[in-house]
Amino acid sequence: HSLDSVWVSDDSEHVFLVDSRGTVKNIVDLREYLDDKEQLLINTNYAIHTSRLYYNKNRQSLMFLTQNLSSKVFAVKEVFINKEKDVAIYYLSPSNIIPDMSAGYSYMSFPNVNYVGENIIYNYPAESSIYTLNIVTNERNSVMAESNYTSNIVAECTSGKDYAALERHRLENPYFYDVMYIPQYKMYA
């Protein structure tokens, strides 16, 4: 693909390769790669979670986060543009600190996901650890990213579905945003 092109996603669960003139060069229907009980999680709403569509130039693939709605398991799927390889699925490890965030954590139940080369970097908004998964070696690592300034774990919200209480919980607790890795400095930010 040319350097003047960009992959764009929309709510139809399609992604489009668009060049600098606005010409659509390629369309990929991500729904084709979802199971019946899966949802696509491409989102940059910082109040909920951040998980972008990623184009891996070296592997000629698109990567995106999914969740199985019955098991609540998160996975990153890798779709190869030329369709010469089958879809690869990389299951994300649950939080080491709060293994089940499906209830009690307000809007903080989805992971933030970023990509650097062959690594998936992710974290959970309710705790400060950073997790990595190498898609070539399947090596998994986690780093306890402890803060000296705030609690490293969000308190569980016990108020049920009361909107005002959920908002209060969100405002009164820390929220751990997506983590990026800057390779030239070997630093997470």
What are these regions, as identified by a protein language model?
Residues 1, 27-46, 86-106, 141-171:
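Surface-exposed loop and turn segments in beta-propeller and other repeat-based domains
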Residues 2, 45-58, 104-117, 171-185:
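Structural signature of eukaryotic scaffold interfaces centered on beta-propeller domains
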Residues 5-7, 62-63, 119-122, 188-189:
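Conserved beta-propeller blade signature
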Residues 9-72:
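Asp-box/WD-like beta-propeller blade repeats and closely related beta-sheet repeat scaffolds
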Residues 17-20, 73-84, 132:
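Beta-propeller blade signature
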Residues 21-24, 83-85, 137-139:
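Short coil turn/linker residues within repeat-based beta-strand modules
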Residues 90-123, 128:
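A long, hydrophobic alpha-helical segment
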Residues 113-116, 123-189:
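Flexible, glycine-rich surface segments
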